[in-house]
A protein has these predicted regions:
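Short, small/polar-rich loop/turn modules that mediate ligand/substrate recognition or access, typified
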Residues: 177, 182, 239-241
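Rossmann-fold cofactor-recognition segment
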Residues: 42-56
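Conserved SDR Rossmann-fold cofactor-binding beta-strand/turn motif
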Residues: 116-117, 182-194, 232, 245-247
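N-terminal Rossmann NAD(P)H-binding glycine-rich loop of SDR-like oxidoreductase domains
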Residues: 14-23
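C-terminal helical subdomain
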Residues: 97, 156-158, 162-165, 185, ...
């Protein structure tokens, strides 16, 4: 069992990829605590209902989380069809806030996995902006930076997935050197989950048709969960700051 004896916190555990990671992590021996804004139907070792877009709610609710944590999977997310302010709060600012709040509870060797996306693949094109946002390290500072550097609704999902990849890389080095905590991200291509339809509305049929020609099919959530569980495990102990594509080859097809 790859995660025997580990305590893993998983956001977005009530649906899709987060739910599948929760199921597989328990199967691999972990004690799993789920977090979501929606109730869960899964068998978990604990569940905390919270809105990850509000730092005050996060601060109040994390008292219910364990004092000692071996892993965190940030799977909660919203598509770009919702308001860009909510995308910023849930997919980036709240994710960072929760992660930083839990770092002091993480044991040496702990692993954090952030779910980015193939849609964040253009991060090198806006690297300077993403580094500036990463340096605005708190929720409040990040929000202030975004107020002076507004992100368009049309590409907000892509923007904050790019920003997440860059923050993961920048912050992972400090976490590994200072606290022996590993942080990585994964970049799935399309996955059969309830938000897949939103991506079609978000990207438009033409882009979806173009990308569809590059892949055999969307992934099933368990095809994403396996690599995430690997990154949580000690087998991945020398993997730090990586952004792992799990996309059936789409990224390779862009070359
Ligand atoms: N499905 C895809 O094609 C795909 C592709 C690449 C990346 N992703 C990313 O994978 C992650 C998981 O998405 P999914 O496909 O499993 O979607 P999903 O909708 O099935 O699951 C997302 C979960 O996040 C929760 N959530 C959303 N907002 C929240 C909030 N404010 N507070 C607490 N919980 C909240 C939802 O309740 C839901 O349970 C997301 O970050 C998404 O951007 C998905």
């Amino acid at each position: 069992m790859k995660l025997h004896g580990k305590t893993i916190v998983i956001t977005g555990s009530s649906s899709g990829i987060g739910g599948e990671v929760a199921r597989l992590a328990r199967f691999e021996g972990a004690r799993v605590i789920g977090i979501d804004r929606n109730d869960t139907l899964l068998t978990l070792d604990g569940f905390v209902k919270m809105d990850l877009g509000d730092p005050a709610v996060i601060d109040a609710a994390i008292t219910a989380l364990p004092d000692r944590i071996d892993g965190l999977v940030n799977a909660a997310g919203v598509p770009g069809t919702v308001n860009s302010d909510i995308v910023a709060r849930v997919n980036y600012l709240g994710l960072r806030h929760l992660t930083e709040a839990l770092v002091p509870r993480m044991l040496k060797g702990a692993s954090i996995v952030n779910i980015a996306s193939i849609l964040g693949a253009d991060w090198p094109h806006r690297l300077d902006a993403h580094k500036e946002l990463a340096a605005a390290a708190s929720f409040v500072l990040g929000k202030a930076w975004l107020d002076t550097n507004p992100v368009q609704q049309e590409n907000c999902y892509q923007y904050f997935k790019e920003a997440l990849i860059v923050w993961t890389k920048k912050r992972s080095l400090e976490l590994f050197m200072q606290d022996n905590i590993r942080m990585n991200s994964v970049a799935p291509g399309p996955v059969f989950t309830p938000i897949l339809g939103d991506f079609v509305s978000m990207l438009g049929q033409e882009r979806v048709d173009r990308d569809s020609a590059l892949v055999k099919r969307p992934a099933l959530p368990d095809e994403i969960a396996g690599p995430i569980v690997f990154l949580l495990s000690d087998d991945a102990r020398w993997i730090v700051g990586a952004n792992l594509p799990i996309d059936g080859g789409i990224e390779a097809a862009y070359v």
